[in-house]
Amino acid sequence: MARNFLTIALPKGKLLTDSLEALTKIGIECQEVSEESRKLVFPLEKAQAQIIICRPTDIPTFVEYGAADIGFVGKDTLLEENKDVVELLDLGFGYCRFVVAMPEEKVPPRLPDGRFDLSGLNHQRVATKFPRVAEDFFREQGMQVLPIKLHGNIELAPRVGLAEMIVDIVSTGTTLRQNKLVEIAPILEATTRLIANRVAYRMKHERINELTEKLRQLLGKAP
């Protein structure tokens, strides 16, 4: 393929629409790209590019190993997968928060500053899709926990005795409330990021930088 040809990895699911909208607004015509299609690879001849549709958790791997030159991925996934890629730009959409939550009847006491006292949670079990993020957070608090990795229904774990607490991503907090869970500590905020393969970023720097700058201008972000 030509040196300036780009393979762009986009995530299935709720981030796909926003990702396609951003690319369209900077002049990359991708009207044919649809998650409803059985296709996973969409050639974009005019743009000298192709889009591949991947599971969100796989995008850092596709980019790290060069199967994609660039990708759109949530910061939550980027932190958990911990792949060797270049993070180029915060795209701003797909906002969510990482939090620690517990059943409302088991929340720890509050400290004088209003925060919950986490010290009694040392060596407790944490149900999560993000064991790396959970361990890193509690390590920063000088604590160790036992992460239990689940792929769904995280909120169920404390109710059935699988774990004492959960680490999960939330947007509105509705699911926590419905399951009688209380947020006891914020961990971090996450949005969608533009990432690049390290070799592609050197070999196709002009093309990738041009796309990055167009997205930056679209978002109104300073360099």
From Swiss-Prot:
<comment type="subunit">
    <text>Heteromultimer composed of HisG and HisZ subunits.</text>
</comment>
<dbReference type="InterPro" id="IPR018198">
    <property type="entry name" value="ATP_PRibTrfase_CS"/>
</dbReference>
<comment type="similarity">
    <text>Belongs to the ATP phosphoribosyltransferase family. Short subfamily.</text>
</comment>
<keyword id="KW-0067">ATP-binding</keyword>
<dbReference type="Pfam" id="PF01634">
    <property type="entry name" value="HisG"/>
</dbReference>
<keyword id="KW-0328">Glycosyltransferase</keyword>
<protein>
    <recommendedName>
        <fullName>ATP phosphoribosyltransferase</fullName>
        <ecNumber>2.4.2.17</ecNumber>
    </recommendedName>
</protein>
<keyword id="KW-0547">Nucleotide-binding</keyword>
<dbReference type="GO" id="GO:0003879">
    <property type="term" value="F:ATP phosphoribosyltransferase activity"/>
</dbReference>
<dbReference type="GO" id="GO:0000105">
    <property type="term" value="P:L-histidine biosynthetic process"/>
</dbReference>
<dbReference type="InterPro" id="IPR013820">
    <property type="entry name" value="ATP_PRibTrfase_cat"/>
</dbReference>
<comment type="function">
    <text>Catalyzes the condensation of ATP and 5-phosphoribose 1-diphosphate to form N'-(5'-phosphoribosyl)-ATP (PR-ATP). Has a crucial role in the pathway because the rate of histidine biosynthesis seems to be controlled primarily by regulation of HisG enzymatic activity.</text>
</comment>
<dbReference type="GO" id="GO:0005524">
    <property type="term" value="F:ATP binding"/>
</dbReference>
<keyword id="KW-0963">Cytoplasm</keyword>
<dbReference type="InterPro" id="IPR001348">
    <property type="entry name" value="ATP_PRibTrfase_HisG"/>
</dbReference>
<dbReference type="InterPro" id="IPR024893">
    <property type="entry name" value="ATP_PRibTrfase_HisG_short"/>
</dbReference>
<keyword id="KW-0808">Transferase</keyword>
<dbReference type="GO" id="GO:0005737">
    <property type="term" value="C:cytoplasm"/>
</dbReference>
<keyword id="KW-0368">Histidine biosynthesis</keyword>
<comment type="pathway">
    <text>Amino-acid biosynthesis; L-histidine biosynthesis; L-histidine from 5-phospho-alpha-D-ribose 1-diphosphate: step 1/9.</text>
</comment>
<keyword id="KW-0028">Amino-acid biosynthesis</keyword>
